[in-house]
């Protein structure tokens, strides 16, 4: 998370903060979806994170995918916006809470360039319907939308 987030958190304390988050559902040539196992809670999630000041949502999605998985990606479609205050509420292991306004994209994998990120314990490719059971609570409905044949964009 950005330095600004931590400054706001320090000033306001443990109350719930509103955060703009960006995620990307990345597919490979076989149609598999790229997920990362998060170091903070061990759940599987799409690449994504908080937007930085001066960054577009698209830039954030591409940056987060590279930082968390080592894959260069390109955006192919806008999946939707997710703002439900209950479904998009998250408590971090340290007890801090956020309500996420999530901008979701779909994309394709271009090239694996590697790298290390302390947010991800591991990464993996999964066919739709074969996702790990321990998906992150915010990601499950987004992944279900991504693999559906329903018209896009979603507004949830």
Model-predicted segments: where are they?
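Short connector loops at helix/strand junctions that flank enzyme active sites
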Residues: 19, 28, 39-41, 46, ...
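Acidic, metal-coordinating catalytic segment for phosphate/diphosphate chemistry
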Residues: 1-23, 95
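Conserved hydrophobic "DFG−1" position in protein kinase catalytic cores
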Residues: 26-27, 35, 107, 125
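Acidic/histidine-enriched, glycine/proline-rich intrinsically disordered or flexible terminal extensions
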Residues: 5-8, 144-156
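Unchanged
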Residues: 51-77, 82-141, 155-156
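Conserved Nudix-box catalytic region and its N-terminal flanking loop in Nudix hydrolases
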Residues: 28-68
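A residue-level structural signature of the nucleotidyltransferase/glycosyltransferase Rossmann-like core
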Residues: 16-17, 32, 43, 123, ...
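A structure-centric signal for secondary-structure junctions around beta-strands
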Residues: 19-21, 30, 120
């Amino acid at each position: 998370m950005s330095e600004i987030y931590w400054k706001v958190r320090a000033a306001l304390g443990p109350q719930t903060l509103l955060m703009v988050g960006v995620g990307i559902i990345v597919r490979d040539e076989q149609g598999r979806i790229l997920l990362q196992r998060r170091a903070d809670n061990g759940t599987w999630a799409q690449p994504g994170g908080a937007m930085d000041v001066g960054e577009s949502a698209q830039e954030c999605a591409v940056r987060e995918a590279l930082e968390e998985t080592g894959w260069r990606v390109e955006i192919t479609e806008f999946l939707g916006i997710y703002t439900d205050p209950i479904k998009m509420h998250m408590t971090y292991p340290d007890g801090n809470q956020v309500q996420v306004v999530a901008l979701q994209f779909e994309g394709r994998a271009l090239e694996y360039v590697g790298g290390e990120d302390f947010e991800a314990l591991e990464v993996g490719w999964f066919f739709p319907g074969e996702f790990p059971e321990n998906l992150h609570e915010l990601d499950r409905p987004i992944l279900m939308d991504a693999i559906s044949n329903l018209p896009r964009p979603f507004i949830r």
